[in-house]
């Protein structure tokens, strides 16, 4: 059984935060259940701080999955997120990749990345 993960990289900026611009691209990914998918967040030159990944599914509020702390090079998962399901790597100050493992149909949705200094 195949299904699509719709991936949209968009810039999200809370009004109270100093924000950085993101270069976004829209990408649809189709993978089989049980496989993995990788999506890339393209960052504006000189982006630092925290890079957040969100999942938005139809009829639900966006859910933050994790964030990458570029100051300590660490990944912080949101409460309730299974370790090993998501991971990030490749922060080169130009992009950050997130891998989704052991895909299930419920992983389908729109994924967003956002960055700001905190």
Curated annotation (Swiss-Prot):
Pfam family, one: V-set
Keyword annotations of the record: Adaptive immunity, Cell membrane, Disulfide bond, Glycoprotein, Immunity, Immunoglobulin domain, Innate immunity, Membrane, Receptor, Signal, T cell receptor
Intrachain S-S bonds: 41-113
Signal peptide residue numbers: 1-17
Predominant location: membrane
PROSITE patterns: IG_LIKE
GO cellular component terms given for this protein: external side of plasma membrane; T cell receptor complex
Oligomeric and partner information: Gamma-delta TR is a heterodimer composed of a gamma and delta chain; disulfide-linked. The gamma-delta TR is associated with the transmembrane signaling CD3 coreceptor proteins following the stoichiometry: a single gamma-delta TR heterodimer associates with one CD3D-CD3E heterodimer, one CD3G-CD3E heterodimer and one CD247 homodimer forming a stable octameric structure. Upon activation, gamma-delta TR complex associates with FCER1G to initiate intracellular signaling.
Name of the protein in its database record: T cell receptor gamma variable 4
Gene this protein is translated from: TRGV4
């Amino acid at each position: 059984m195949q299904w699509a993960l719709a991936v949209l990289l968009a810039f999200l900026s809370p009004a109270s935060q100093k924000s950085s611009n993101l270069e976004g691209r829209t990408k649809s990914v189709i993978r089989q259940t049980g496989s993995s998918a990788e999506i890339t967040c393209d960052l504006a030159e000189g982006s630092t701080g925290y890079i957040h990944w969100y999942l938005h599914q139809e009829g639900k509020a966006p859910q933050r999955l994790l964030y990458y702390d570029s100051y300590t090079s660490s990944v912080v998962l949101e409460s309730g997120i299974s370790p090993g399901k998501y991971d990030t790597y490749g922060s080169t100050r130009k992009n950050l990749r997130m891998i989704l493992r052991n895909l299930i149909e419920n992983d389908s949705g729109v994924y967003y990345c956002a960055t700001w200094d905190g």
